[in-house]
């Protein structure tokens, strides 16, 4: 049985929305199921459209192939291929901050 974590998403206006995300589901998929409108493109971890930045907590994004080690160390995450591994808070809409 999957462990369910509380994932708080902070949009560009600072509005916080907390959703329950099982550890075997991608954050983006569950956010969409909850009616949230987050940016995405490839859904495969190969671009940066869905990028967010982790404020607190941890994820498993081993399926991603776009971010480099430096970006990951700074807390960037691709929500389309990120599984929560703890309760966490993510600032969404961070693609432009990567460059």
UniProtKB/Swiss-Prot annotation:
Pfam families: Fer2
Keywords: 2Fe-2S, Electron transport, Iron, Iron-sulfur, Metal-binding, Transport
Cofactor note: Binds 1 [2Fe-2S] cluster.
Cofactor: [2Fe-2S] cluster
UniProt-listed GO biological process terms: electron transport chain
Boundaries of every 2Fe-2S ferredoxin-type domain copy: 5-96
Biological role: Ferredoxins are iron-sulfur proteins that transfer electrons in a wide variety of metabolic reactions.
Protein name, entry field: Ferredoxin-1
Annotated source species: Desmonostoc muscorum (Nostoc muscorum)
